[in-house]
């Protein structure tokens, strides 16, 4: 079941986040699996599997196979495995959680499908969206962002630390996790509001164990 401590440092990634790796699709897949294991060994508190963008896998069978490998690693190290967006995949794999955005399946539908099976995270980009979600008991936490500019969400308006503050000040009690452009250097600004989710801060770090350690301790 859901424990808000798992939001402390969530690694979010798919094979597309290793575009800086030389080689083809399989090299990116292997880089993801190697990085995930290193990150789990270094004590990330959760992993969110996210296949999105031009370089993401397109074949559902390949996506499922990769998701299963990631899930196995999470089980080995006792970290929650969360599927981004793909509710059906989360159900098939009996994932621990599912995370959806405002443009994905309607949250009411996600709740109907996943309630009592997965914990549910919902992305919000405005205070209004957060206020709308506050009474949805089945939503375990809110993902807030992008806090800083980020290549993974080029089309999204940066919301800044201000939105985290507004949500907290509004009296919303749900746990929050900040995402978008978070690095070891700006993570300390966010800790008072809840957890942090990162992609490139781990995926592109030269020393991944050091990056995780710094993000955990700073944050």
Swiss-Prot record:
It comes from the Bacteria. Binds 1 Mg(2+) ion per subunit. One of its GO terms (cellular component) is cytoplasm. It is an enzyme of class 2 (transferase). The keyword Metal-binding applies. Pathway: Cofactor biosynthesis; thiamine diphosphate biosynthesis; thiamine phosphate from 4-amino-2-methyl-5-diphosphomethylpyrimidine and 4-methyl-5-(2-phosphoethyl)-thiazole: step 1/1. 2-[(2R,5Z)-2-carboxy-4-methylthiazol-5(2H)-ylidene]ethyl phosphate binds at residues 150-152, 181, 199-200. Pfam families: TMP-TENI (PF02581). Its cofactor is Mg(2+). Its EC number is 2.5.1.3. One of its GO terms (molecular function) is magnesium ion binding. Keywords: Magnesium, Metal-binding, Thiamine biosynthesis, Transferase. InterPro entries: Aldolase_TIM, ThiamineP_synth_sf, ThiamineP_synth_TenI, TMP_synthase. 4-amino-2-methyl-5-(diphosphooxymethyl)pyrimidine binds at residues 48-52, 84, 123, 153. It catalyses: 2-[(2R,5Z)-2-carboxy-4-methylthiazol-5(2H)-ylidene]ethyl phosphate + 4-amino-2-methyl-5-(diphosphooxymethyl)pyrimidine + 2 H(+) = thiamine phosphate + CO2 + diphosphate; 2-(2-carboxy-4-methylthiazol-5-yl)ethyl phosphate + 4-amino-2-methyl-5-(diphosphooxymethyl)pyrimidine + 2 H(+) = thiamine phosphate + CO2 + diphosphate; 4-methyl-5-(2-phosphooxyethyl)-thiazole + 4-amino-2-methyl-5-(diphosphooxymethyl)pyrimidine + H(+) = thiamine phosphate + diphosphate. Gene3D superfamilies: Aldolase class I. GO terms for biological process: thiamine biosynthetic process; thiamine diphosphate biosynthetic process. Mg(2+) binds at residues 85, 104. Condenses 4-methyl-5-(beta-hydroxyethyl)thiazole monophosphate (THZ-P) and 2-methyl-4-amino-5-hydroxymethyl pyrimidine pyrophosphate (HMP-PP) to form thiamine monophosphate (TMP). NCBIfam families: thiE (TIGR00693). Belongs to the thiamine-phosphate synthase family. HAMAP family: TMP_synthase. PANTHER family: THIAMINE-PHOSPHATE PYROPHOSPHORYLASE, THIAMINE-PHOSPHATE SYNTHASE. This is Thiamine-phosphate synthase. It comes from Helicobacter pylori (strain ATCC 700392 / 26695). The gene is thiE.
């Amino acid at each position: 079941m859901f424990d808000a401590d798992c939001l402390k440092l969530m690694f979010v990634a798919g094979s597309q986040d290793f575009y800086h790796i030389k080689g083809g699709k399989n090299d990116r897949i292997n880089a993801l699996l190697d990085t995930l294991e290193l990150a789990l060994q270094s004590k990330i508190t959760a992993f969110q599997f996210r296949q999105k963008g031009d370089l993401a896998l397109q074949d559902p069978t390949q996506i499922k196979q990769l998701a299963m490998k990631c899930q196995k690693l999470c089980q080995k190290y006792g970290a929650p495995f969360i599927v981004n967006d793909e509710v059906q995949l989360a159900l098939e794999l009996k994932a621990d959680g599912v995370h959806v955005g405002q443009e994905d399946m309607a949250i009411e539908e996600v709740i109907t499908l996943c309630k009592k099976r997965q914990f549910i995270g919902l992305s919000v980009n405005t205070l209004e969206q957060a206020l709308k979600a506050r009474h949805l008991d089945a939503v375990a936490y809110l993902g807030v962002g992008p806090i800083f500019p980020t290549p993974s969400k080029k089309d999204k308006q940066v919301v800044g630390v201000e939105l985290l503050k507004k949500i907290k000040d509004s009296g919303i009690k749900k746990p929050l996790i900040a995402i978008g452009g978070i690095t070891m250097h700006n993570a300390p600004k966010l800790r008072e509001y809840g957890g942090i989710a990162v992609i490139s801060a781990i995926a592109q770090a030269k020393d991944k164990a050091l990056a995780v350690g710094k993000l955990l301790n700073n944050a």
